[in-house]
């Protein structure tokens, strides 16, 4: 038996292993994962409960992965055994990697969902409210599709006042994602302009999962999330649930269903308006009756108030006239009395003058008695100074006065007088 060097034996092992295990499929758990930022190569180990084997995934193959490789994932790798002669190491040079129980597309979608969930793309708090009565709606679909024809038909029946605008878009195959993203951006660019859309509806009919899978793309999700206009996703049939359905402000099971959800039913609203009209008419009649009754009550009150004010003013005028008459009469009597006092005592002895004096005194006493017994209004009182009637305008500060009526008598001092 020939003696071999280490290099020779490793070279023979390399030739044997690489020829024998040219293509292998190996299942195990990913561990010790390292991804080089510069080269883009990924190095990791694949292990089970008893053994470990090193693996390498070079950049070109790594770029074809539809999901992110992470530690702890149960994977099936497809590749070939390669031997590094200087160290006598061997590893699996991976060409493809797939999840053990689900496909790579499914795993990639789940990872993307988690990424967008953490960014808040699915949060209800970030959803825009559905417009109540949309006037202008952008429909992103193929203008020759059955979906567009169905949507126009339903919209014309439900809410003919709404203008549907079709933005012709490639809805499957290569270039679909970019076409949809550009159409969403165009429709949303009119936001806050006179031609703004109240809603954007991304719609297409059913198809295979391969046909619909473009609507699981992150770029479409970004376009819907960043749009300032309310958006709806209406892709496929009710059983089809895509990433665009989760990100859009509202999901419809089909394009036709989108019109039923978005647009109000004009027949139902006409019935509601009829009901509102009846209620409004009834409420108006009740309100009119109440206001009429209130105005009648107010008119009666004003009439009573006017009568009472007039009565009060007349009473004040009468009282003022009585006081003026009394003052003039007393003034006249005092004048006559003064004249009589100037007459000599001898003259007063004449029977004629004696009779007149007695008559004058009798009149004065009668007037005072009438003054004492004069009936005043319940709110009034006689005003006098030094037992003589006086007008209010004649008073000055410091005067001591008497107030009296048939029930009481009071004294007072004038503190101030304001002239009107």
UniProtKB/Swiss-Prot annotation:
InterPro entries: Exonuc_VII_L, Exonuc_VII_lsu_C, OB-fold_nuc-bd_dom
This protein's GO CC annotations: cytoplasm; exodeoxyribonuclease VII complex
A GO term, aspect molecular function: nucleic acid binding
Catalytic activity line of the entry: Exonucleolytic cleavage in either 5'- to 3'- or 3'- to 5'-direction to yield nucleoside 5'-phosphates
Localization per Swiss-Prot or TrEMBL: Cytoplasm
Domain of life: Bacteria
Similarity annotation: Belongs to the XseA family.
Subunit (UniProt): Heterooligomer composed of large and small subunits.
Name by which UniProt lists this protein: Exodeoxyribonuclease 7 large subunit
